[in-house]
């Protein structure tokens, strides 16, 4: 007879951290240059006017202004920054 109870082992018990993807600045919001607009994997949304694309496909503002999303049919969805009138 065993003196101690045999302990089972489980192959579960792991989970990865969320990647926190998605739109960070929504349409109509005012942003400053360098603000992250969208964190994404792949180019689900493409950069438009005054928007840059990082190496991980993150879209960011190149200038101060208002965020504007546009769906251009077969060309896809674009995000642009409309500069604030001085």
UniProtKB/Swiss-Prot annotation:
Keyword annotations: Ribonucleoprotein, Ribosomal protein
GO molecular function terms noted in the UniProt entry: structural constituent of ribosome
Gene Ontology terms: cellular component: cytosolic large ribosomal subunit
Membership in a protein family: Belongs to the bacterial ribosomal protein bL27 family.
Protein name, per record: Large ribosomal subunit protein bL27
GO BP terms in the entry: translation
InterPro entries referenced in this protein's UniProt entry, alphabetically: Ribosomal_bL27, Ribosomal_bL27_CS
Organism of this sequence: Koribacter versatilis (strain Ellin345)
């Amino acid at each position: 007879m065993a003196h101690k109870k045999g302990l089972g082992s489980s192959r579960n018990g792991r989970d990865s951290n969320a990647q926190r993807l998605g739109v960070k600045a929504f349409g109509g919001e005012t942003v400053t240059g360098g603000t992250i607009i969208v964190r994404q994997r792949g180019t689900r949304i493409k950069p438009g006017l005054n928007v840059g694309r990082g190496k991980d496909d993150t879209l960011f503002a190149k200038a101060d202004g208002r965020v504007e999303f546009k769906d251009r049919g077969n060309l896809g969805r674009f995000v642009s920054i409309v500069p604030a009138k001085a």
